[in-house]
UniProtKB/Swiss-Prot annotation:
Reactions mediated catalytically: ATP + H2O = ADP + phosphate + H(+)
GO cellular component, one term: cytoplasm
Keyword annotations from UniProtKB, A to Z: ATP-binding, Cytoplasm, DNA damage, DNA recombination, DNA repair, DNA-binding, Hydrolase, Nucleotide-binding
Residues reported in the UniProt entry to bind ATP: 21-22, 63, 66-68, 129-131, 172, 182, 219
GO MF terms, alphabetically ordered: ATP binding; ATP hydrolysis activity; four-way junction DNA binding; four-way junction helicase activity
Keyword flag Cell membrane: no
Keyword hit for Signal: no
Family: Belongs to the RuvB family.
UniProt name for this protein: Holliday junction branch migration complex subunit RuvB
Gene for this chain: ruvB
Stretches for region Small ATPAse domain (RuvB-S): 183-253
Region listing for Head domain (RuvB-H), in residue ranges: 256-333
Amino acid sequence: MEERLVSGEVLGEETALEPSLRPQYLHEYIGQDKIKENLKVFIEAAKLREETLDHVLLYGPPGLGKTTLAVIIANEMGVKLRATSGPALERPGDLAALLTSLEPGDVLFIDEIHRLPRAVEEVLYPAMEDYCLDITIGKGPDARTLRLDLPPFTLVGATTRAGALSAPLRDRFGVISRLEYYHVDQLAQIIERAAAILQIGIEREAALELARRARGTPRIANRLLRRVRDFAQVRGEGGITLPLAVEALERLQVDRLGLDQIDHKLLSAMIEKFAGGPVGLETLAAVIGEEAQTIEEVYEPYLMQIGLLQRTPRGRVVTPAAYTHLGMEVPKR
């Protein structure tokens, strides 16, 4: 799958750049107001009691700020953050080494926690519940279990697929929060903040235009800002104006709803080859040359969210709004 400008996932170039745009404390964090207010209370209460914060599970679509909140939690608690990911912890020993290196109060952040192997996940249970680590020494009838005490710590888990978490793991989190897509005005504020950090001027209307095409996702908003900044700087203009933003986004092939070429290809194929549907997932995948899982997990969610596509028992169906958006006549059914 090619890298998409409107993908919520981290693209290669962004690994080093994202931290520079990331807010460090709750008062700098824009959006997710309910989560933010609750975390403020939980953090203040933990500090008053001189205890570690309860384990936190953050879930929601990619690019909404789960990693940023983990950084903020550590900063607000005044402790170190140790970050890893589910796929990186292949064996129980990998997690054991990480847990035994923690200092009291540390925040351990595990991204994509739903991808932890079951054997590794089981090591987490006593670590989360009793701050201890059970190590098996030897094999067979002579095997014995050695229990090691761990310093108190806070686990922050992040996932895009909360339903894929096992019940025993999910139940051990004291704080569970779902991150929602952002409103346009919130994204515009995020864009203006990032523009100030990147030292590029941007008109309010231009920030709003970028926000409208960012699919409710801060990561996409910041990515669009950086690409439009390229156009502004190459042209020698002092900042990003609305006309420049619109022209740049059109050249980047991101339309006014945030759809790109692949979205248009999917919708057009359904309309032109299947009269708008219903069409089966496997058939659609074969026609547009993409894997069925990629269509279901990457492309469809946003199209359904904005009302251009529906899943029905008989298959996928394009809505009248999709015809209108693509400039096609809505068929009479």
